[in-house]
């Protein structure tokens, strides 16, 4: 993962603010402020030679093989992201769809972010890693923020919708957040209690409505503990949750989560799972922000562990697709938003049980195709540009070239 995706290169988830998801858009300008095979959502810009991912060693040594477990995890997580987006318009008419939506949203982005943090452990301010952070995260963020804005102008008949690199729209928030988290990695590596500190910051953000929308800081700060958790993990921690006992325990845990989500669906504001707002903005008392942040952090960690427990560690047909999750993440958003803009959900049969099943299968199939090598080759110029022309050459490297 270290040199194989957004979380690996440097280390996702229609509509308006009221019903948006963890990757959903919000209106802009609101009053309160505002390498090859590297394209996976959790690996961009870091080189972690301990993780078993592809990273060239000095002297032209062979690259280590990618860890199939993490590629499988990223692929399955991106499938859940796409399915979650397809379920969103079904929630009002189907309590079951709402329960599935809530359950998935409780852990799919935390899982991505934990993996991103895990593959950021070796990140420092070395020149080559900063370059990968820029080309693997910052540049795709700029390109897709502009692309999504033009898409909204055209598809939503909103020709004056503004371009803003400080107010990410829809899916692009994750790239901006990852860029910020990755830059702060050296700080988290020197503090004594990084996870409690990150959790304190998240709690304070959840009770601070004046933070504003710029840089989507609420999400950056409220999701921060998951990234820091990833920085603190070691390979043995992943082995621990993949034991047979963990898989057995995960079954009643997931069943209980679904039952609770079914009960909570008509009673709970799903916006809590998006980590995009302070408690006061959700019409809740300020203290509930702290309570919900801590409670949801614990629940998300448990569900992420249960999710990891069922991830195969062997190479499978989908393992290679894990290197292309960034492509699936960013590209499927055009269809997810377009389906709303073009009123595809107005068709009655989609809101039937069989319609929901077919929609779920379609979402999984589409995002799978978007992760495939042909799509990666087609869009690599935007996702993984080399941009050697933009950086100064290393004097040592230049001397070697002359000799």
Give the ranges of each region predicted by the language model.
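Alpha-helical transmembrane segments and their immediate juxtamembrane cytosolic regions
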Residues: 2-30, 37-403
């Amino acid at each position: 993962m270290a040199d194989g995706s957004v979380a690996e290169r440097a280390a996702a988830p229609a509509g308006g603010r009221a019903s948006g998801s963890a990757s959903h858009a919000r209106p802009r300008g609101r009053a309160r402020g505002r390498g090859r095979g590297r394209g996976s959502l959790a690996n961009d810009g870091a080189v972690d030679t301990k993780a078993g991912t592809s990273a060239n060693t000095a002297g032209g040594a062979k690259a280590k093989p990618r860890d199939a477990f993490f590629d499988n995890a990223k692929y399955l997580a991106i499938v859940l992201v796409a399915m979650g987006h397809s379920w969103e318009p079904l929630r009002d008419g189907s309590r079951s769809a709402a329960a599935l939506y809530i359950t998935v949203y409780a852990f799919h982005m935390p899982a991505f972010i934990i993996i991103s943090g895990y593959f950021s452990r070796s990140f420092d301010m070395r020149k080559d890693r900063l370059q990968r952070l820029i080309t693997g995260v910052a540049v795709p963020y700029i390109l897709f923020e502009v692309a999504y804005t033009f898409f909204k102008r055209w598809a939503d008949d909103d020709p004056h919708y503004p371009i803003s690199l400080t107010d990410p729209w829809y899916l692009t928030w994750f790239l901006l957040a990852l860029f910020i988290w990755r830059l702060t990695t050296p700080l988290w590596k020197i503090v004594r209690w990084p996870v409690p500190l990150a959790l304190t910051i998240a709690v304070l953000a959840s009770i601070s409505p004046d933070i504003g929308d710029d840089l989507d800081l609420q999400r950056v700060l409220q999701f921060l503990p998951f990234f820091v958790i990833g920085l603190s993990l070691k390979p043995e921690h992943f082995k621990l949750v993949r034991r047979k006992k963990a898989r057995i325990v995960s079954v009643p845990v997931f069943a209980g989560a679904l039952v609770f989500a079914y009960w909570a669906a008509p009673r709970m504001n799903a916006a809590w799972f998006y980590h995009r707002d302070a408690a006061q903005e959700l019409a809740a008392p300020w203290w509930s922000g702290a309570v919900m942040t801590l409670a949801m952090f614990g629940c998300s960690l448990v569900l992420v562990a249960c999710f990891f427990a069922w991830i195969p560690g062997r190479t499978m047909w989908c393992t290679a697709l894990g290197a292309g999750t960034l492509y699936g993440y960013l590209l499927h958003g055009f269809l997810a938003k377009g389906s709303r803009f073009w009123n595809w959900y107005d068709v009655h049969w989609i809101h039937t049980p069989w319609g929901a099943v077919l929609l779920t299968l379609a979402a999984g199939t589409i995002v799978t195709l978007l992760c495939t090598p042909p799509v990666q080759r087609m869009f690599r110029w935007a996702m993984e540009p080399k941009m050697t022309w933009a950086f100064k050459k290393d004097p040592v490297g230049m001397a070697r070239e002359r000799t």
